[in-house]
């Protein structure tokens, strides 16, 4: 069973329907025990880092996800789900940084509105951008059959930091991770 994690925000039904459409046994859940014992986890996007972090801490979901990942449960993070893999995030965090899962080092922060030359960019970043694979990304199952330079759709104002887990990047004001991978079971 694939657990689509409900943290009281997110595009839950569309993710559940998509997984079911391709033959997955997907179920939306907020239950830490179901999360801990699921065959695979999906943490969907939409919402603010601070709200998601607070809800996931209060409900025990953070610890359940960490426990599942520690035993090797496959994980897919989408948008905010990618950011939550990091140590923390500043989105709507009135008192600095809210904690993330801490699987990857670094803090998700607001995307700069200007590049290094002072050129202005619209934030949020909404639209199609090409991605560039890191050298070893060609072996990632996340990009099986997808050529380097392919276009993906983005809608966001916050970005994950570059890290050893970065397997693809794109550029909008700055170059940032479009995808990350930890080992052979954690993808976003």
Where are these regions (language model features)?
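Cysteine-nucleophile active-site neighborhood
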Residues: 47-126
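Short glycine-/small-residue-rich Rossmann-like dinucleotide-binding loops
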Residues: 9, 45-48
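Short acidic/histidine-rich motifs immediately flanking catalytic phosphotransfer sites
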Residues: 35-45
């Amino acid at each position: 069973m694939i657990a689509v994690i409900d943290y009281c925000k997110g595009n839950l039904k569309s993710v559940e329907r998509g997984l079911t459409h391709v033959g997955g046994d997907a179920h939306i859940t907020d239950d830490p025990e179901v999360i801990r014992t699921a065959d695979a986890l999906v943490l969907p996007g939409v919402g603010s880092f601070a709200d998601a972090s607070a809800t996931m801490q209060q409900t025990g979901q953070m610890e359940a996800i960490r426990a599942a990942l520690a035993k090797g449960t496959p994980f897919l993070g989408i948008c905010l789900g990618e950011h939550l893999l990091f140590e923390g995030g500043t989105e709507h965090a009135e008192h600095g940084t809210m904690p993330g899962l801490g699987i990857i080092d670094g803090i998700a922060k607001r995307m700069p509105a200007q590049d290094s030359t002072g050129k202005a960019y619209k934030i949020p970043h909404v639209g199609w951008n090409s991605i560039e694979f890191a050298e070893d990304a060609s072996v990632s199952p996340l990009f099986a059959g997808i050529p380097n330079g392919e276009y993906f759709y983005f809608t966001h104002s916050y970005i994950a930091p570059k890290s050893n887990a970065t397997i693809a990047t794109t550029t909008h004001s700055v170059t940032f991770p479009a995808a990350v991978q930890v080992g052979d079971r954690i993808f976003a």
